[in-house]
Amino acid sequence: TMQRILGEHAFDGKNVTVIGYGPVGQGFARRIRALGAEVTICDIDPVASLKAVFDGFAAQDIDEALPCADMVVSATGVRHTVTLEHMRAMHEGAALAVIGGIANEIALDEVSDFTPQVNRDTVQLNVPDGPTLTLIADGDGVNYTVGGGNPIEIMDLSFAVQASAVAYLLEHRGTLDHTLIDRKSVV
């Protein structure tokens, strides 16, 4: 989706900082590295940062990585992962996005004159006392706001598994131990 928005060669030789090295951040980092990006990982968990290094990525503190980043992508699902001070540290014209995510993963509520734009893939974000950034999908999750989201077949499967789990819990209410369930006994 981001490649569609920013262009076919959006990641070629770009310095991309990915904040969060959970499953979403890992998948995105691998994908954009394959598309030619130089990827730096920022994660407050030292084990996740070490995993990123073992996976061949640079790992830095967010304050060190942001000034050099052509693009910053938050993949944490944590409110205010990218603060107003972080935005001020970015360079003019850098792109800023969220993948997955929640409302205000980028602290846009601290940018006084920011107004979300309907049906806009990108918008110029004038950071108070800072640079103008290219904000993708109004700071909402790119994959579900400007992209097609998850395929319906995947959503059907996900909801079916969730419904099966709820049915199992209801059927066995009061009789379940507080242990892990063997997959074979559920099927």
Q: Where do the protein language model's features map onto the residues?
A:
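Adenosine-phosphate binding glycine-rich loop
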Residues: 1-8, 108-187
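Glycine-rich adenosine-cofactor-binding loop
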Residues: 2, 7-33, 40
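Secondary-structure transition/capping motifs at alpha-helix termini
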Residues: 8-9, 36-39, 60, 90-93
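Residues in the short beta-alpha loop(s) of Rossmann-like NAD(P)-binding domains
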Residues: 22, 44-45, 102
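Short, solvent-exposed amphipathic alpha-helical segments in soluble enzyme
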Residues: 31-35, 88-91, 112-114, 150-153
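NAD(P)-binding Rossmann-fold cofactor-contacting core
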Residues: 33-55
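Rossmann-like adenosine-cofactor binding region
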Residues: 49, 55-131
